[in-house]
């Protein structure tokens, strides 16, 4: 009797555990100045971001530092967020490659001066999986 009950419970709950639709990770910048949590809902294709002591915000709509042309591309568990930040003659192109299979985040910043590429910076964040 008890064995059948345990098998029934396992049969009901294991598919939900195995087919998890939400993924979460915590990432810290290489200089340890920025830290954020990232949560990805793969069924709704929604990426949420939360810094320490702040509320969850939709990362694909949220403007972090006067960004323009924010765009998110979803490819299974890999999300690429691109944006531009314009100054008078300069502008930045910022790309965030967030990978929930490897639990990694790579930030690529391209600095343009007078429409010419001046500098390219790659920041590899230290990320850790957070169990939900």
Question: Each predicted region: which residue ranges?
Answer:
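N-terminal glycine/threonine-rich, aromatic-flanked beta-hairpin/loop signature
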Residues: 35-65, 103-115
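Ser/Thr- and Asn-enriched, surface-exposed coil loops between beta-strands
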Residues: 43, 62-83
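Edge beta-strand at a domain terminus
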Residues: 111-132
